[in-house]
Amino acid sequence: MNFLQKLEHAWATQNSLLQVGLDPDPARFPAELQGRPDAILSFCRGIVDATAPFASSFKPQIAYFAAHRAEDQLEALCGHIRDKYPHLPIVLDAKRGDIGSTAENYAREAFERYQAHAVTVSPYMGLDSVEPYLAWRDRGVIVLCRTSNPGGSDLQFLPMADGQPLYLHVAGLVADKWNAHGQCGLVVGATYPNELAAVRKRVGDSLPLLVPGIGAQGGDINATVQAGANSARAGMMINSSRAIIYASGGEDWREAAAEAARGLRDAINAVR
């Protein structure tokens, strides 16, 4: 089963488009985990176990682990998800963008060391920076397209010679040329529903969209679903991180995360 098949299976069997982002910040951990050498792993594992019934994928952000010299804990976390929830894909949020042997090693890091099912990448250096990931035919490659941050407009909205904005050129390039083996997806922020709709129209049902910006960043659930869903009323990994994993800083942090995930899943399903 390749990444897209695994993701589609998770959407259907979990009845969920929710992706839980894992962005561990030890300063925000509950008191019971403070000072523990395995605090990052323990926190993320607790969040995963609490939210797995309501999620269709998980997205660990590699920088939150690397900054605390906790790559080994990320490796253990990915192993925990694969072992306990083998039906739920892991999307490693790395946003890599180099070329040649460097990119090949980044791909090995994502797919061999962490055994992620997909990874996020930057298209700025062109196909050369994406091909090393595409060589792993059963894995997903999620390409930055129209990101949720305000500064994304500095480049992504610039007009091409034919008048279309750069982000739509990227969407077309990925859909028409880079997705020969059905491996690719796009990152498109919920904070720009008009652009999200334009991307979905451009790529049709061919690509899954990873949609950050719901929750702490203020994206609207109804607008997001109406703009980004495919013809099967799926096709999206709607990501929420902080609003779920930091729903409570007290002893009820697991239960609060579960309720936040349940509530967001249900809110998404209500407008599908």
Curated annotation (Swiss-Prot):
Q: Which cysteines are joined by disulfide bonds?
A: none
- Which pathway is recorded for this entry? Pyrimidine metabolism; UMP biosynthesis via de novo pathway; UMP from orotate: step 2/2
Looking up SUPFAM superfamilies in the UniProt record yields: Ribulose-phoshate binding barrel
Active-site residues, Swiss-Prot/TrEMBL: 95 (proton donor)
Lyase among keywords: yes
Do you know which InterPro entries this protein is assigned to?
A: Aldolase_TIM, OMPdecase_AS, OMPdecase_type-2, OMPdeCOase_dom, RibuloseP-bd_barrel
In terms of CDD domains, this protein maps to: OMP_decarboxylase_like (cd04725)
**Record's keyword annotation contains Lyase:** yes
One of this protein's GO BP terms? 'de novo' UMP biosynthetic process
Coiled coil (residue ranges)? none
The EC number(s) attached to this protein equal 4.1.1.23
As its record notes, the protein acts as a catalyst of: orotidine 5'-phosphate + H(+) = UMP + CO2
Q: Which GO terms describe its molecular function?
A: orotidine-5'-phosphate decarboxylase activity
Mind listing the UniProt keywords for this protein, alphabetically? Decarboxylase, Lyase, Pyrimidine biosynthesis
* PANTHER family membership: OROTIDINE 5'-PHOSPHATE DECARBOXYLASE
The UniProt entry, under NCBIfam families, shows: pyrF_sub2
Family assignment from sequence similarity: Belongs to the OMP decarboxylase family. Type 2 subfamily.
Q: What is this protein called?
A: Orotidine 5'-phosphate decarboxylase
Gene behind this protein: pyrF
